[in-house]
Amino acid sequence: MPLKIRELIKILKENDFVDRGGKGSHRNFLHPSGAKITISGNLGDDAKPYQEKEVKKMVKEVQENEKK
């Protein structure tokens, strides 16, 4: 069962990403390290598989960079 967009946003916020707004259903998130990611879709929508992979990849990269 796919995650909801709101769940992806929660994961990003738990990992220190800041919501920088956006147009329409797009939301831009910025991490203090400079990492950027855009999530599209309304909060209750199912996330696309590529969105889930992108968020997991971005969180993993940020966590690895913080360890250095």
Model-derived features: positions:
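C-terminal structural segments of small proteins and small subunits
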Residues: 43-68
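A short, structured beta-strand/loop element
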Residues: 19-45
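Hydrophobic aliphatic residue packing
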Residues: 5, 9, 37-39, 55
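Polyanion-binding surface elements
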Residues: 1-16
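Extended, charge-rich alpha-helical interface modules
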Residues: 14-15, 37, 64-68
